[in-house]
Amino acid sequence: MDLQRMLDRCRREQWTVDDLDWSARPRSLSRADEEAIVQLFTDMAGIERLAGALFEEQQRRAQDPVLREIFATFIADEERHAVVAEQLAAFYNVHRYRTYQINEHLRKFRPHFLRALRYLSDDVANMYITGGELILDIALLRSINDYVADEMSERAMALINRDESRHIAIDYHMTGYYASPAYLAELAQRPPPSLLTRVKAWYTFLGLIYRAAPFSRAVFFQPMRLVDPTGRRMREAFKRMQLMSSQQGIDNTPFGKLQLFLLQVSHHPVAGPLLRGVAARIAGIEPEFMQRLYSDEEMARARRMDFDGLAREALASKLAS
């Protein structure tokens, strides 16, 4: 990837909340739909700010000055998305049936997640952001937009999705780097962490795993059952994660080995039905998404591609789903 070209694109495609015309009126909604839509956008604001915190950590760790500038634009993107989500919540809150607050599980997860960021290795932090962005871009945002079915949401989501596509391109690029011999060489040159740091890292990581499942269920899986009841887009997002997680070099790091092991256990013809629930709990997702979601042909094709090619194919899948 040409990082300077990507940075130029990031700067060129910036926009503001005021670029959207907020003077329109929303379409008529039932009470149930209005309450659901306002809550969805309220939670979306919290999710976007969580993504922004991850990009702040990635910017802090990045050594390449161009990459740091790219992450700076991503941080601005996520805050802008959060503000737009808040304004969309207000826009559709016509009847003010009740008071809306960010989902309790999202609120409780945030401080533990931010604390864990300080101890997560580079590849782990990147894998969390990549997974979250794939769910957002391929599944959640587009399904919310279809559910709302209103011009105001469509205009906002078009701009947000354009930003998220840039994010995913960089997420995959960084995943490729963390799967490379160059990253292993960089790790070997770093001084080993102290025993106290390793203990804190494991403690925060185990705490993150413990809280990830209820967070993911409340913020991603339950809303998707409402806005995408067939689960088609969610399966597509997790298929892209599985294809990426099976690429050469992913198992270079302990977290990559754990990911691959959980997938292999879940896909095993004998152990899978017995242990898939346990593997899903560790991964923080629903068991159905630990099943094998790709064909042999799709895996063979993916293994012939580099990570930038996988990103392009993941983004192209949005149009097909």
Please annotate each region the language model reported.
Residues 1-321:
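Non-heme di-metal
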